């Protein structure tokens, strides 16, 4: 079977040939998906760059190898909402990049995939500011609902462009956890975020599109929500924030997991320790499918360590998997 067929079997827990790093995809994205502005910027720019993205959020690239940091928030004040100009998902300046990337796609062993980076929660605090938004959930709930609804209106507009181009897989993402627990209370998530998420999931599920979701941190409070929404692949499954056995138990046969190799291990090494952890994760999470093996964060790891990671997945990721240490 080719790489795409194998990935489908992983997602469906249906006897794949091997564990791989992730679904093979040809990514589509619009101008602004990675925080670009009409005048440039984005995460590939040099350290020290300052720019304004398509939403009016001001950014500063402070560290090499990671995304910039939002430093100015156009909706920090509730009064700013009345005069705020929302980005238009039909703006040809945004879509030119999307159509160029779509024209480069050749059907075969990859999914045509779309991206909705900072789908809802993260986009809202970039617009409003984290501290402000945390207060406004309680003091200005109508304002928060308006902001979240308009963000999702934009995402739905982009989704319709993706669907017209024939996407089979989409990547969504909002970091909802800390190392110890949820970033937001379950009541806040249920009242403010979940209704908006349902709008986007409903559209994609109606078109039988696979949905991947990126959520850093502890997953205990949101895992049932992701299962209910219909997330097909969840990443990055942070080792230091989760009980991996419990996460696998709750998702077995229902949702594939991606990631789960510790950033701490990958940064510190040595290669022998990385190999041992990969073998442990393969057996722990992937015995019956449903697992893509990779880092639990995207950081600039030493090349020797990433080489050791992928070599271990290649060597030990073929089914039937072998238990580590002769178990």
Where are these regions (language model features)?
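Helix-coil boundary/capping segments in enzymes
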Residues: 28-101, 107-109
């Amino acid at each position: 079977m080719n790489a795409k067929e194998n990935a489908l079997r992983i997602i469906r827990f249906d006897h794949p040939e091997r564990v791989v790093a992730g679904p093979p995809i040809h990514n589509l994205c619009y101008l602004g998906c990675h925080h670009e502005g009409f005048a440039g910027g984005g995460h590939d720019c040099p350290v020290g760059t300052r720019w304004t993205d398509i939403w009016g959020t001001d950014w500063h690239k402070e560290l090499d190898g990671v995304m910039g940091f939002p430093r100015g928030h156009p909706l920090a004040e509730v009064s700013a909402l009345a005069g705020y100009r929302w980005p238009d998902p039909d703006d040809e300046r945004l879509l030119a990049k999307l159509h160029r990337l779509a024209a480069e796609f050749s059907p075969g062993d990859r999914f045509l995939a779309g991206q909705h980076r900072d789908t809802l929660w993260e986009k809202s605090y970039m617009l409003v500011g984290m501290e402000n938004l945390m207060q406004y959930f309680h003091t200005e709930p109508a304002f928060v609902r308006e902001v979240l609804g308009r963000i999702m209106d934009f995402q739905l507009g982009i989704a319709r462009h993706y669907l017209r181009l024939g996407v089979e897989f989409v990547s969504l993402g909002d970091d909802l956890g800390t190392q110890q627990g949820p970033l937001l209370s379950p009541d806040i998530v249920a009242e403010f975020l979940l209704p908006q998420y349902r709008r986007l999931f409903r559209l994609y599920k109606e078109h039988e599109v696979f949905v991947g979701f990126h959520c850093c941190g502890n997953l205990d409070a949101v895992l049932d929500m992701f299962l209910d929404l219909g997330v097909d692949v969840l990443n990055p499954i942070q080792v230091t924030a989760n009980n991996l056995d419990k996460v696998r138990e709750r998702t077995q046969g229902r949702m594939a997991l991606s990631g789960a190799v510790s950033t701490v291990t990958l940064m510190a090494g040595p290669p022998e320790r990385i190999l041992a952890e990969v073998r442990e994760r393969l057996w722990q999470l992937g015995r019956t499918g449903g697992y893509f093996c990779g880092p639990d964060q995207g950081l600039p790891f030493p090349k020797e360590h990433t080489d050791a990671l992928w070599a271990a997945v290649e060597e030990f990721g073929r089914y039937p998997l072998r238990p580590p240490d002769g178990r």
